[in-house]
């Protein structure tokens, strides 16, 4: 009985060694992948693993700060643009204490045509976000457009949708109907 017990102990020891070896190989692979994502280090001498990890952590923190700055800049630009639009419509009585980050009269749509590509910008309130799905349905099912890009962003109570679609060059009838049909959908809410 004693010999079988020692074989089991050796087997467990080998299993642990194999597991540890696999773990080290996996960690080495993960470290390599992490370091490959960093901008190249200008130093000629290679960094130690702890230095590489510190550099990765610092780089991630720097990216987080940049993202937060860009979000703040976006919020400011949206507020500025909205204020300019409100003022250009003749709403000069807006006081500075009013939150202008969301346009007062929603939804709004802007359509730009570049050849057979339409760029559609839709701003809705959170309660009217269904309108985006309706616009996609009308474009694809009724007008035969092909959606090439769709996305949205939520800022405060506004949803900013962007949509790019392609209509065949020879299908002028559908192309001419797009602005009219989409504005009809948007204006049905007012």
UniProtKB/Swiss-Prot annotation:
Biological process per Gene Ontology, one example term: defense response to fungus
Keyword Amino-acid biosynthesis found: no
Region: Disordered, residue numbers: 1-21
One Pfam family of this chain: HLH
Recorded GO MF terms: DNA binding; DNA-binding transcription factor activity; protein dimerization activity
UniProt keyword terms in alphabetical order: DNA-binding, Nucleus, Transcription, Transcription regulation
GO cellular component: nucleus
Highest taxon, organism lineage: Eukaryota
Alphabetical list of PROSITE patterns matching this protein: BHLH (PS50888)
Family per similarity comment: Belongs to the bHLH protein family.
Protein name listed in UniProt: Transcription factor bHLH162
Gene symbol of the encoding locus: BHLH162
């Amino acid at each position: 009985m004693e010999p079988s017990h020692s074989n089991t102990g050796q087997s467990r020891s080998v299993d642990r060694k194999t597991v540890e070896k696999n773990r080290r190989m996996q960690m080495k692979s993960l470290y390599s992948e992490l370091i490959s994502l960093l901008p190249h280090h200008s130093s000629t001498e290679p960094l130690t693993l702890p230095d590489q990890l510190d550099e990765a952590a610092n780089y991630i923190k720097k990216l987080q700060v940049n993202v937060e700055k860009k979000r703040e800049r976006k919020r400011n630009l949206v507020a500025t643009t909205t204020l300019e639009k409100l003022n250009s419509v003749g709403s000069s009585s807006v006081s500075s204490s009013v939150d202008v980050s969301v346009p007062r009269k929603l939804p709004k749509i802007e359509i730009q045509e570049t050849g057979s590509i339409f760029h559609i910008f839709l701003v809705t309130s959170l309660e009217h976000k269904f309108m985006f799905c309706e616009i996609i349905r009308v474009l694809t099912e009724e007008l035969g457009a092909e959606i090439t890009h769709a996305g949205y962003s939520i800022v405060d109570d506004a949803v900013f949708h962007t949509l790019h679609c392609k209509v065949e060059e020879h299908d002028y009838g559908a192309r001419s109907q797009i602005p009219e049909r989409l504005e009809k959908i948007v204006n049905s809410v007012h």
